[in-house]
Regions:
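Conserved catalytic-core motifs of GNAT/GCN5-like acyltransferases
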Residues: 34, 93-94, 106-125
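Short loop/turn motifs at secondary-structure junctions and domain boundaries
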Residues: 8-12
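Conserved acetyl-CoA-binding loop-helix of GNAT-fold acetyltransferases
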Residues: 58-61, 67-80, 103-107
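Conserved acyl-donor/pantetheine-binding loop and adjacent beta-alpha core of acyl/acetyltransferases
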Residues: 31-58, 66
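Conserved GNAT acetyl-CoA-binding A-motif
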Residues: 75, 82-95
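Conserved small/polar residues in nucleotide/adenosyl-binding loops
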Residues: 1-5
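Conserved beta-hairpin
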Residues: 13-30
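Conserved active-site alpha-helix within GNAT-family acetyltransferase domains
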Residues: 72, 84, 96-114
């Protein structure tokens, strides 16, 4: 599935979230999923717990605002939304070479739990207890 189809599917399922400036300019997008992630059922490693969790996929920040804390704010808002819904855990995966995401996850104290396969590709799996 191409990224455009993935985003359309996210929106259809109610997963698509955007972060906007005060003027309404969309500066970030992510799929915030509370239904679980089938790819997380098998992990080469161990999750921190087995409680319900939120997942974030496809976090993207507009090029013109990179380096301005937009991804950090999106993560904060995702965690707030999870807490408001009574979800105490946040799982996420990323490519091994995604340095920006790896730094962001370290900043928020995510724990590396192992490796999963998402869409056929190996990914590093992380979790944070909220």
């Amino acid at each position: 599935m191409c990224i455009r189809d993935s985003i359309t599917d996210d929106i259809d399922r109610g997963y698509g979230h955007v972060l906007c400036t005060h003027t309404g300019l969309v500066v970030a997008y992510g799929a915030v999923v509370f239904d679980g992630e089938p790819a997380y059922a098998e992990i080469d490693g161990t999750w921190l717990d087995q409680a319900p969790y939120v997942v974030l996929h496809r976090l993207a920040v507009a090029q013109e605002v990179k380096g301005q804390g937009i991804a950090t704010e999106f993560m904060r808002r995702t965690m707030t939304l999870a807490r408001e819904r009574g979800t105490g855990s946040f799982r996420i995966d990323t490519n091994f070479d995604n340095r920006c995401m790896l730094r962001l996850l370290a900043k928020f104290g995510f724990v590396r739990c192992g490796e999963i396969h998402y869409a056929g590709d190996p990914r590093i799996a992380f979790q944070k207890i909220l």
